[in-house]
Regions:
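Extracellular/luminal ectodomains and secreted, surface-exposed scaffolds of diverse proteins
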Residues: 140-171
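Catalytic core of carbohydrate-active enzymes
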Residues: 1-134
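Solvent-exposed, conformationally flexible loop/turn segments
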Residues: 25-30, 166-173
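A generic structural signal for beta-strand entry/edge sites
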Residues: 105-109, 122, 153-158, 175
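Short beta-strand element of the conserved SAM-dependent methyltransferase core
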Residues: 43-45, 101, 149, 170, ...
């Protein structure tokens, strides 16, 4: 199948959802996209932060799982995103939570506002497009163990896993910054 990736001519970066590497495409040109049976091609536009929870059998079960983030950097090394959280059941929401994400200068910032208390922890953060080896990784100034950090220099992917113990009160219980 052929497709065009918008914005390539102006420096927009796209990442393959599955292998998390930057797409090699030319501006204004059809790019062949592999789409065998059973595979849906999905791409992430650089400059986006995507919150995730594990897909489970029910909404209620999913609501009780840890959070993960994928930050896909643009060519300037930045990204933004927003997460809206409520109880998932009420028709009229009395308490909600809005979390803003910003990546700038080798740091991911999360800032929440609202009255809804989401107690699910943050498990993992994946940053796509990290062009150089990260330094010490910290969450709110506390060192993340080296065993929890991996960097793929070829794919330019930074993965930070096992953050549950550092976010036991809930991923969005307080504002935080992850630096690398």
């Amino acid at each position: 199948m052929d497709g065009v990736f918008p914005g390539i001519s102006t420096g927009t970066r796209w990442y393959d959802w599955y292998n998390q590497t930057a797409v090699s495409a030319s501006a204004y040109t059809n790019t062949t996209i592999e789409a065998p049976l059973g595979h849906i091609p999905v791409y992430i536009r650089g400059g986006s932060v995507l919150p995730q929870q594990e897909p489970l059998l029910t909404t209620a079960a999913c609501r009780n799982s840890s959070w993960s983030l994928i930050a896909a950097l643009d060519i300037e090394g930045s990204a933004t995103g927003t997460l809206y959280v409520d109880d998932g059941e009420s028709l009229m929401q009395e308490k909600t939570l809005l979390v803003d994400f910003t990546v700038a200068g080798r740091a991911l910032y999360a800032s929440g506002r609202g009255l809804y208390a989401d107690t699910n922890t943050l498990a993992n953060v994946t940053v796509l497009g990290v062009g150089s080896v990260p330094g010490n990784v910290t969450l709110n100034g506390a060192a993340v163990p080296g065993s929890a950090v991996t960097y793929d220099g070829t794919g330019q992917v930074l993965k930070v896993v096992g953050l549950q113990n550092m976010t036991q009160a809930g991923a969005w219980a307080q504002d935080w910054v992850l630096r690398w």
